[in-house]
Amino acid sequence: MDRAQKQESIEALKSVFADAGAVVVTHYMGMTVAEMTELRSRLRKEDATFQVVKNTLVQKALDGSIGEAGDALFTGPVAIAFGSDPVSAAKIVTQYAKENDKLKLVGGILGQTTVLDEAAVRALATLPSLDQIRGKLIGLIQAPATKIAGVLQAPAGQLARVLNAYATKDAA
């Protein structure tokens, strides 16, 4: 890799750390190509990415912004998982790590400054995704309106039933 390619990789990593809500750091030692491909396809379904990175390039891209604790994440054979939704990548990687002992969770970076340990990444994976939170929020917003509409329609329905009862009584 020549100097221009390294600089290009550093810029790409900077944009990853800036744009991704959370970056999950893993050790992938011993994983086969088929296992990596399966993990990547699972992540791709959720609009996330799994990328093997060079530690020195990551440390230059982060430029010391996360301190020594963050630099300690990037030792050995490291791959990062990231996506537009901070929770989805953590969820998929955590689930895959349970199924495959070769993939080890090391930690993560939330935002650009907060370093997460393995337990924090597992806790992040238990949170609902952004789409699930939006769905719950919309449900909470719509519920009162639906109840109000039901309450407002109830007297009209009762009146219609009373009139129908009188009509059937008079017809009989």
Swiss-Prot record:
GO terms for molecular function: large ribosomal subunit rRNA binding; structural constituent of ribosome. It holds the Pfam family Ribosomal_L10. Disulfide bonds: none annotated. CDD domains: Ribosomal_L10. This is Large ribosomal subunit protein uL10. GO terms for biological process: translation. Keywords: Ribonucleoprotein, Ribosomal protein, RNA-binding, rRNA-binding. GO terms for cellular component: large ribosomal subunit. Belongs to the universal ribosomal protein uL10 family. The gene is rplJ. Part of the ribosomal stalk of the 50S ribosomal subunit. The N-terminus interacts with L11 and the large rRNA to form the base of the stalk. The C-terminus forms an elongated spine to which L12 dimers bind in a sequential fashion forming a multimeric L10(L12)X complex. It comes from the Bacteria. InterPro entries: Ribosomal_uL10 (IPR001790), Ribosomal_uL10-like_sf (IPR043141), Ribosomal_uL10_bac (IPR022973), Ribosomal_uL10_bac_type (IPR047865), Ribosomal_uL10_CS_bac (IPR002363). Forms part of the ribosomal stalk, playing a central role in the interaction of the ribosome with GTP-bound translation factors.
